[in-house]
A protein has these predicted regions:
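Glycine-rich Rossmann NAD(P)(H)-binding loop
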Residues: 170-175, 200-207, 218-222, 230, ...
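Substrate-positioning beta->alpha
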Residues: 151, 171-192, 198
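A hydrophobic C-terminal alpha-helical subdomain
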Residues: 232-304
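N-terminal Rossmann NAD(P)H-binding glycine-rich loop of SDR-like oxidoreductase domains
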Residues: 4-26
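Non-catalytic, hydrophobic alpha-helical segments
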Residues: 15, 71, 185, 189, ...
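Glycine/proline-rich active-site loop of Rossmann-fold NAD(P)-dependent oxidoreductases
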Residues: 153-160, 191-200, 223-225
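NAD(P)H-binding glycine-rich loop region in Rossmannoid oxidoreductase-like domains
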Residues: 7, 32-96, 100-103, 118
């Protein structure tokens, strides 16, 4: 596959940054689609070119596909903001990119989906993503769909609960997952695209039960593991009730995470970084930030 220029959509996100770095290291011309070029530059995004535009607004994309051979989109919203819905971003924004890619005769469009999407069609986030994948597959363009089991960045909730002293799990805690590091996933994406693969279900090198993941979080904090198992009926009940008692900004991501917690999320093993290393990095980073805070000096007592 002889490609030289890649447009990365979602370039300022967790995975997008790793993809930009991966393709820069491979010597490609990387055009990063960003909402604010100055902010992206200040945040340390190192791409060949920053193209300022919003995928939700097709008028801002004029010229984005010029000379592009490959589009990689990680666009999606896990936590809703700016008044945009999953259908606005996960579906329509990607559809706008696809329309422009087709008009520009881009060779291939790669999209980051989610593992086990077919089992979560009732979840709005997943439904919007799957609708775009269906449109992509129906389009006359070569495509690669990558379905990761979960990102390391999504595992922070386990560490946060452990930090508070107790991790709560639904059911036995024996369901398995193998989340993957962003840099490892970027390598998978580049390899799959180069090989012309259509669909890649992928996860990290280590498959853990939810219990083991919780234990790893406690170990990183040097705390004794305290895990409470809630009856799974609570999780299933929350899936039914949350849409009626919380705004979409709350129940949208909750429905996805609660659904994923109710099944095995194990993709094809790849990579070298383990979750325990990620937890250790997070703990170290928090400690360094705490140490860097200026110390408050206490005024000495007056001598009388």
């Amino acid at each position: 596959m002889n490609t030289t220029t890649v447009l990365v959509a979602g370039a300022t996100g967790y995975l997008g940054r790793h993809i930009v770095k991966q393709y820069m290291s491979m010597g490609w011309h990387v055009r990063a689609l960003v909402r604010n070029a100055d902010a992206a530059r200040k945040s340390g995004l190192d791409a060949t070119e920053l193209f300022e535009g919003e995928a939700t607004n097709p008028l801002t994309l004029c010229g984005a596909m010029d000379g592009v051979n490959l589009v990689i989109s990680t666009l999606g919203i896990t936590r809703q903001r700016d008044g945009l819905s999953y259908w606005d971003v996960d579906y329509q924004a990607n559809a706008n990119l696809l329309t422009d890619a087709l008009a520009a005769k881009v060779e291939r469009f790669a999209y980051v989906h989610v593992l086990n999407a077919y089992r979560m069609q009732e979840v709005p986030l997943v439904a919007a993503k799957q609708a775009f994948v269906d449109r992509l597959h129906a389009s006359p363009i070569k495509s690669t769909v990558i379905a990761p089991s979960g990102f390391f960045s999504d595992m922070g909730d386990f560490l946060n609960m452990a930090e508070s002293g107790r991790v709560f799990l639904f059911g036995s805690g024996n369901l398995e997952l193998n989340p993957i590091d962003g840099a490892d996933l970027a390598e998978v994406i580049a390899s799959a695209i180069w090989d012309g693969r259509d669909y890649v279900p992928v996860g990290g090198p280590e498959t853990l039960t939810q219990n083991e993941l919780a234990a790893a979080a406690f170990k990183a904090l040097s705390k004794p593991a305290k895990i409470t198992h809630l009856p799974d009926i609570f999780r299933r009940g929350a899936l039914k009730v949350l849409p009626y008692v919380t705004p979409s900004a709350v129940h949208g991501p909750a429905l996805f995470f609660l659904s994923a917690l109710g099944m095995n999320m194990v993709g094809t093993s790849y990579g070298s970084k383990h979750v325990s290393e990620h937890f250790a990095d997070l703990v170290r980073s928090k400690q360094e930030k705490a140490d860097a805070k200026p110390q408050t000096l206490l005024k000495p007592q007056s001598l009388t």
